[in-house]
Amino acid sequence: MIIMKKIGILEIVVILSILITSVSLAYKFYSNNGNDYEFDGNQMYKCAWVCEKILNKNFPLNATIIGKWTLSKKPFNGEVKIYDAKGGTLYAIYNGTPITIGGELAYQEDIAAKKIILHPIGKSIIFYELNPIEGKSFRDIANEIENTTKNFNGLNIVDVIVEGSMGVDSKTYTPVERQKIMNNLDVDIKKGLGLYFVDYGIIINGKIHLNTLKNLDNYINSSNISTSKLTIYVVVNNSIDEIPNKIKENYAIITLG
């Protein structure tokens, strides 16, 4: 009975410590209102947790990483774009190349981080759905989407993200041509964009930045494009209080905090 009582007390202490840590992290995250978040290299699980919360809300996320390359041991101090976080590992893009970031003692990841400073992009996201769009080129599709963002003139738009699928009439691509297209879109594919090559065309599925969508004509020659219903995420560097009431009454809004 005494042993069972001791185990019970230890379990309570562990549970309380987990709850206190979770509450403190949640308070820090939800009360931050868009400022930076700083972590030491021994706080990777906490850092990844915050990254997931930010990314799941569709906010773009940059970070300053201070540490070293695990292979060469050379110092690393640079800005990266984080696109995923799992366990104690961050997945990011550095100079156009995917890299992984672990804690100070990491050896499997590309970077062993001593310090991580997260920089979420934007303070609010206005999102809405668009009915299917048709066009001859990716520029046509992008222009239609961009026209809808004119409803937010006066706000500081920092990014526009498009989610949905597109059927593209083009040609049947050879293996070499397919690989070249995939190479050009490597970063977006790493972020989750799906490319499906079919006879006489391509199906594109997932999330894509509007600026990337505009440039797809450089890699894919299309004759016709038809989209599914699209979800548009307009990232603005304005707090909820700075967004006009007319917009708040007509659109759904996500805030960082």
UniProtKB/Swiss-Prot annotation:
One of its GO terms (cellular component) is membrane. The chain crosses the membrane at residues 7-27. It is found in: Membrane. Keywords: Membrane, Transmembrane, Transmembrane helix. Pfam families: Regulator_TrmB. InterPro entries: Tscrpt_reg_TrmB_C. It is a single-pass membrane protein. This is Uncharacterized protein MJ0418.
